[in-house]
Amino acid sequence: MRLNLISFFIIFTILVSISNSQEFRSYTGEGNNKQNPKQGSIFTPFIRLANPIKFNKNGFPNITNQPSRAISNIIFDQQTHIGSKEHLTDMFNMWGQFLIHNMALSKPEPNSWPIKVPKCDQYFDPACIGNKTMNYFRTRATEVPCDVGKTVVDEDGKCYEQINSLGSYIDGNVLYGNSEEICKNLRSLSGGEMKMTVTDVGDLPPKNVPGVPMDNDANLFPIDQLYSVGERRGNENPGLLSIHTLLLRDHNRLARKFARLHPEWDDERVFQQSRSCIIEQIQKITYDEYLPTTLGSFPSYTGYDANVNAQVSNEFTTTAFRFGHSEVGPFMEYYSENGTRLQPLPIKFSYFNPHALNRGVEPLIRGLIINEEENIDIYMISDLRNFLFGKPGQGGLDLASRNLQRNRDHGIPPYNSLRRQLGLRPVQTWSDITSDPQIQNRLKNAYKSVDDIDSYVGGLAEDHMEGSCVGQTFYLIIYEQFFRTRAGDRFWYETPEMRMVNRECETTTFAEVIKRTTSNIGYVQPNVFRK
């Protein structure tokens, strides 16, 4: 009996020692890879899967296709609702946006490259003036060693790559910020909790927190009315903000739990443990629910590999993972507890609108998990294509044009060239891309040949792979990225070390997160990404 007690106290002492000395992630991503501490951290270059197109002597890509807005008008114009073939919900595209806001951000530089508007454009040049443009500022880039290969090369032989302003790991920086200073500003600094505002409709993120920079691209409301969260784009739409809210509530629930179970822990220890559990929750939802819904399946974890670079690829963030923009429907839907559809909010009025949460997150969450999203294809709703962040002529933009312009700015090669470099067979005819005659006709009207197609357009136009909601090209890019994201993360939740650290986390499905962080939510299907 005495031996058993001694053994117990030895094991307990070891566990306490491990717990107290535990290394947690940095906020910047730095130090994750011990061999290359900067790898995957903030303000480091994207990597490439394919060689970019050539740039001219002025530093601009050699483009012979029509301007981006002209392509947008031919290809992306959506007139009718086209429901998801896979019966996916609006929550699916919201999680995708939340996820990419954790992994990548291309910040602009002062160098402008305006998007030419076709004369007599219905929205942006109705008076047929013929000299209208839309603002586009080129992505910030940095000089890199030419021996890394697959980089943009200028006329002087110097090599450049666009900068990822976020850490590339799935590390919760979307909630906690990508610096210790921002995170401290968002913390209550008491009991390991995050700052929240108590309201009649539940706890919501705080507003106007000093030292926490937030975007306000629409300028519909003063910036001091916007919510403060860890990623500056958090107010882009209320669906995105609702996911922030749920996970912040869950963080504080965990903090209260750990403070109760471990009275010897200080605020910092409780906070870091709660943060680690929320990161695990985000990773688990992404790999157990989101990726199988996107790709049909995803292989099991095989362990950490320090030789794998988890940095985001340019093709992933600039091209393939922008498929989500075609999923967005014309309204933010709200539902009551008994399933009654409430007054919806048009997307064009949802941008950076803090009042969209005045009824709480519950009506919006119900809408996200009930409503079927738009199909993933070449079509994009008018509120994104003509009214992004404002009215045409009053600051409004075209998201499809911006995506195309960014692909060209980053030197993403044409569709067939990209396919070849990815090891895929190049297409010969329009019907090799899609079996849909209407999409074939739009491609023919926009491009001279299949070799001219912009990769963003070609990838969206493809027939979906069986069991997946995307075509072959985007499938490969997305699969490749998320394989590296997981394999190259020393703090991945499935490593033996992190399983020990997070043994009290009790992570669950996304459906269970919703149930425990909302009030009177009603029925929540097991897979909230599918109807």
From Swiss-Prot:
PROSITE patterns, sorted: PEROXIDASE_3
Protein name: Peroxinectin A
Domain of life, per lineage: Eukaryota
The keyword Glycoprotein appears for this protein: yes
GO biological process: defense response to bacterium; hydrogen peroxide catabolic process; immune response; response to oxidative stress
Site, as annotated: Transition state stabilizer: R233
Catalytic center residues: H101
InterPro entries: Haem_peroxidase_animal (IPR019791), Haem_peroxidase_sf (IPR010255), Haem_peroxidase_sf_animal (IPR037120)
UniProt-listed Pfam families: An_peroxidase (PF03098)
Leading EC class: oxidoreductase
Signal peptide: 1-21
Glycosylation sites: N62, N131, N338
Induction summary: Induced by srfA, during development. Down-regulated in grlA null-cells at 16 hours of starvation.
A molecular-function term among this protein's GO annotations: iodide peroxidase activity
CDD domains in UniProt: peroxinectin_like_bacterial
Subcellular location: Secreted
Keywords carried by this UniProt record: Glycoprotein, Hydrogen peroxide, Oxidoreductase, Peroxidase, Secreted, Signal
One annotated Gene Ontology cellular component of this protein: endoplasmic reticulum
UniProt-listed Enzyme Commission number(s): 1.11.1.7
TM stretches of this protein: none
Protein species of origin: Dictyostelium discoideum
